[in-house]
Design a protein with these regions (language model features):
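Hydrophobic, well-ordered secondary-structure elements that form the walls
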Residues: 300, 356, 393
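Short, charged/polar surface micro-motifs in flexible loops or helix N-caps
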Residues: 22, 45-48, 305-309, 361-364
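Gly/Gly-Pro- and Ser/Thr-rich, intrinsically disordered tail segments characteristic of DNA damage-repair
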Residues: 1-240, 247, 286, 368, ...
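Short small-residue beta-strand/loop micro-motif enriched in glycine and branched aliphatics
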Residues: 81, 308-313, 365-368
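A short glycine-rich, hydrophobically flanked beta-strand micro-motif that places a catalytic Asp/Glu
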Residues: 150-154, 295-299, 354
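DNA-contacting surface of Y-family translesion DNA polymerases
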Residues: 7, 16, 205-348
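C-terminal hydrophobic structural anchor segments
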Residues: 321, 325-390
Length: 421
C-alpha cells in the first residue's frame, strides 16, 4: 500500500474496517448464551475490576470502556462480566485479516480490531466500492462468525475512511466523497476527528477554528501556525483530498512498553509485585525477539494510589534483550535507591500501576560482539526458546523463573498497534 500519496485523489477507494465491540463480540460468538445480553469483558472480574470492552448491548445501557465493574453493574445490573481471552482475540484477528486479503493484497491491520483495505489498484476489478464493503461484511459473518459485525468507512484516503467508519455504529457503512464531506463534518466536533484530543482542540479553538468544517477550509499556513507543527498541513491535505501522509511509514517500533494496573491481590506481598515486574520484562523480551531487535535504553515507572510517581531511566553500555537481565537491572536500581534514601520499598502495597518500556532499538544482526563476554550462545538459545513457544504454545516450554503455582500476571491485549501481538 502506498502510504505517502501526495497527488489529488477524490475516488473513494480506501476501506477502513472497524470491528464492533470486538472483544465482547468474540465472546458472544463462541458462547451462544451471551448473545443479546450486555457483556463486559474484564481482565479481572472482581468488584475492583475494570470493563475494557463492553458489548453493543452494554453500550446501549450506558456502560463505557474503562468503567469500574461495580459502577457498570450499578448502571446495568444484568451485565455479564467475562474474563478476557487474548489468544481467542488474536485467532479472530487472523481470520478477519485472511478474509480481507481475499478482496485485496493491500491490507494493513491498524490494530487488533481495525484494518485498511486499499482498493486503489483494483478499480478495474470492482466497479462499486459500496458493494465490496457489503460483500466484506457478509464474508466476515460467513467465514469468521455470524455474530461478528463491523462498520466500514469508504473514502479517498485512510484518514477520511477511518472518520467515515465512526459515523454509523454498529454495522454501519458510510462513504465520504467531495460531495458529501461537508455534510459529514458539519455533524461532528473537533475531538471526533482521528488524532485530535482535548489539548489540540483547545489550541485550534484558540486559533479561531471551532469546528471540523472550519478546519477543512482553514489555510495551510494558518493551520501550521496554530498547531505549531506540520501536522496542521497534514490535516489540510487529508480533509481536502490532496494526499495521504503517513508519518510512520517504516512500520518499525520506536518503543515498546508493558504496563499493568495492579489489583489488591497483586500488591498483597512484595514477592507478588516482584513477580509482576519480572513478567513485564519477559513480555518485552518476547516482543523484542519477535521483532528481532535489541534495546539500548529502558525506563521503569510506577504510580501510587496517592497520585505520587516513581520514574527511572537507564541507557545500556551494551544492547539488551534478555528479560531477566532487564529485571535485575531495575531491581538493583530500586535497592540502591532505597538504601541511599532510607525510604520504604518502591514496590509496596500502595502501588496502583507499573510500567516498563524499552526504546532505541537496533537490529539483532547489528548488535556488536562484546569484548568481555560471549553472549551469542545465550542469544541463540533465547531465540530458539521463543521459536518453540510460538510453534507449540507459550506454556509448553518455560524457564525456571516462569514457573508459578498461581501466576499473578495474566495475558492481555490492547486495542492499539498490533506489531507486538
Amino acid at each position: 500500500m502506498n502510504r505517502n500519496r501526495l497527488t489529488e485523489c477524490v475516488l473513494p477507494t480506501v476501506l477502513f474496517v472497524d470491528m464492533n465491540s470486538f472483544f465482547a463480540s468474540c465472546e458472544q460468538q463462541v458462547n451462544f448464551w451471551l448473545r443479546g445480553r450486555p457483556v463486559g469483558v474484564c481482565v479481572y472480574t472482581g468488584r475492583q475490576g475494570c470493563v475494557i470492552a463492553p458489548s453493543v448491548e452494554a453500550k446501549l445501557r450506558g456502560v463505557k470502556t474503562g468503567m469500574r465493574l461495580d459502577e457498570a453493574m450499578a448502571l446495568c445490573p444484568d451485565l455479564v462480566p467475562v474474563e478476557t481471552h487474548p489468544s481467542r482475540y488474536r485467532e479472530f484477528h487472523v481470520k478477519i485479516v485472511a478474509v480481507l486479503k481475499k478482496f485485496s493484497d493491500d491490507v494493513v491491520p491498524k490494530s487488533i480490531d481495525e484494518a485498511v483495505v486499499d482498493l486503489t489498484n483494483y478499480q478495474l476489478v470492482y466497479k462499486d466500492m459500496r458493494k465490496v464493503a457489503q460483500d466484506i461484511k457478509q464474508a466476515i459473518r460467513r467465514d469468521v462468525g455470524d455474530y461478528m459485525r463491523c462498520s466500514i468507512g469508504i473514502a479517498p484516503n485512510v484518514f477520511l475512511a477511518k472518520l467515515a467508519s465512526d459515523v454509523q455504529k454498529p454495522d454501519g457503512l458510510t462513504v465520504i466523497t467531495p460531495d458529501t464531506i461537508d455534510d459529514v463534518l458539519r455533524s461532528l466536533r473537533l475531538t471526533d476527528l482521528p488524532g485530535i484530543g482535548r489539548g489540540m482542540a483547545a489550541r485550534l479553538e484558540a486559533g479561531g477554528i471551532h469546528t471540523p468544517l472550519a478546519l477543512r477550509y482553514a489555510s495551510p499556513d494558518h493551520l501550521k501556525a496554530v498547531c505549531q507543527s506540520i501536522i496542521g498541513w497534514h490535516w489540510h491535505l487529508r480533509l481536502n483530498f490532496s494526499g495521504e501522509v503517513d508519518l510512520d511509514s517504516s512500520g518499525a517500533n520506536k518503543s515498546m512498553s508493558a504496563m499493568r494496573t495492579i489489583s489488591p491481590e497483586q500488591r498483597s506481598t512484595p514477592e507478588r509485585l516482584e513477580e509482576l515486574l519480572l513478567s513485564l520484562c519477559l513480555t518485552l523480551e518476547r516482543r523484542m525477539v519477535r521483532q528481532q531487535v535489541f534495546c539500548q535504553e529502558m525506563s521503569f515507572s510506577c504510580r501510587y494510589q496517592s497520585g505520587k510517581t516513581y520514574n527511572y531511566e537507564v541507557r545500556f553500555p551494551e544492547p539488551r534483550q534478555d528479560g531477566p537481565e532487564l529485571y535485575q537491572i531495575i531491581n538493583q536500581r530500586l535497592l540502591t535507591f532505597q538504601e541511599a534514601h532510607r525510604c520504604e520499598p518502591v514496590l509496596n502495597e500502595h502501588l496502583r500501576s507499573m510500567c516498563v518500556a524499552v526504546f532505541r532499538f537496533i537490529p539483532t544482526e547489528s548488535v556488536p560482539l562484546s569484548l568481555f563476554s560471549d553472549t551469542s550462545r545465550k542469544d541463540k538459545l533465547r531465540q530458539t526458546l521463543h521459536d518453540l513457544k510460538a510453534k507449540f504454545g507459550s506454556d509448553k516450554l518455560l524457564r525456571a523463573t516462569e514457573l508459578r503455582d498461581d501466576p499473578v500476571y495474566r495475558d492481555v491485549i490492547g486495542f492499539g498497534n498490533i506489531k507486538d501481538l
